Amino acid sequence: MTAIVEAFGKPHVNVGTIGHVDHGKTTLTAAITKHYGNFVAYDQIDKAPEERKRGITIATAHVEYQTEKRHYAHVDCPGHADYVKNMIVGAAQMDAAILVVSGVDGPMPQTREHILLAKQVGVGYIVVYINKADVADADMIDLVEMEVRELLSKYGFPGDEVPVVVGSALKALEDDSSEYGKKSIDKLMEKLDEYVAVPPRPVDLPFLLPIEDVFSISGRGTVVTGRIEKGEIKTGEEIEIIGLKATQKTICTGVEMFKKLLDKGSAGLNVGILLRGTKREEVERGQVLAKPGTITPHRKFKAEVYILKKEEGGRHTPFFANYQPQFYLRTTDVTGSIKLLDGKEMVMPGDNVSVEVELQVPIAMDKGLRFAIREGGRTVGSGVVSEILE
């Protein structure tokens, strides 16, 4: 069991509210915490604390609540730009998103943008809450549901299966006992519990460790250190060293932590791993150790990126096609060039765009890997791999 499960005695899921401005994301967050958590007032959520991830400041409010079956951590962002940054930078990885759509207005531009981003960054499940049902016309609500389902299907979510709950976050917040009031929140929680699968714990995934440092210990061989990102490793297991150069195979002959030898190392631990027959110069920071056959090195990929504004410490000027910054992937900087898509000629600070990246050397990667874009050692943007090209 993970530490989180032990702490709450229940499986843990990360969720977030997404949707167009003023459709009621924060009111819904307040209503959920009122009935299922430690109540957090609307104006407290709206004064979200600032969180820094990779040098990027994002205002995010974290609240928590629980049903009989699960514990949920919930993130709500005050501004649209913060949602975009949060999803790309992954300040809070969302396992599922609650898409809030006003029953009066229906889907709007940010509704689409948030759905597309959710898909690109790997949010697994979406549950829909059609809000403001108390002031919307019944026919309009049916139409909105149809439109939202079509939109979800268009962006690769199972639009026909996605649960849709109709209600009024404001009524729920006011303790109204009608169908659109507290009952709609109960129904939403029920749907989250039923529809969203608990994500596999990192320890159950295949072993992966990004190498941070390499040492040579006389008489014992080469030791690499780093934090195990996922899975576990036992002495005697075969592993691959991937990225930067040709993939090599080796055997783990020991796992150490604080000078003690362990039987195995698992996700979340900072460890040293002894490698059999591997020379000091054959391994370097930026490579990863992984279970054989589970991850491959790549140079070309598509990504969703957010470029910092000048006020956020980013560039002061736009960049153009073939811009060549450094990409900080896991533990190392690699130079690469950016190709702009969809006929775009330049990218302004503050923009969120889809790009193609070609690195100078291959790096172990999967869809969903997050990275920082740096120039002269400072972060100028952030991104997430949306598709591997080669």
Curated annotation (Swiss-Prot):
The segment annotated G4 runs over 131-134
Q: Under which EC number(s) is this enzyme classified?
A: 3.6.5.3
Q: Which EC main class describes this enzyme? A: hydrolase
| G2 as annotated region, ranges | 55-59
- Give all residue intervals belonging to the tr-type G domain: 10-201
Q: Do you know which InterPro entries this protein is assigned to?
A: EF-Tu_GTP-bd, EF-Tu_GTPase, EFTu-like_2, EFTU_2, G_TR_CS, P-loop_NTPase, Small_GTP-bd, T_Tr_GTP-bd_dom
Annotated spans, G3: 76-79
Q: Where is this region: G5?
A: 168-170
Q: Name one GO molecular function term.
A: guanosine tetraphosphate binding
Localization, per the record, is: Cytoplasm
A UniProt-annotated Pfam family: GTP_EFTU_D3
- Provide the catalytic activity annotation: GTP + H2O = GDP + phosphate + H(+)
- Any one cellular component term from GO for this entry? cytoplasm
The residues listed in the UniProt record as binding Mg(2+), with positions renumbered to this chain, are T26
Positions bound to GTP: 19-26, 76-80, 131-134
Q: Which terms are listed as keywords in the entry? A: Cytoplasm, Elongation factor, GTP-binding, Hydrolase, Magnesium, Metal-binding, Nucleotide-binding, Protein biosynthesis
The family database entries (HAMAP family) matched by this protein are listed as: EF_Tu_B
User: What is the role of this chain?
Assistant: GTP hydrolase that promotes the GTP-dependent binding of aminoacyl-tRNA to the A-site of ribosomes during protein biosynthesis.
Stated family: Belongs to the TRAFAC class translation factor GTPase superfamily. Classic translation factor GTPase family. EF-Tu/EF-1A subfamily.
Q: How does it assemble?
A: Monomer.
What is the designated name of this protein? Elongation factor Tu 2
Gene designation per UniProt: tuf2
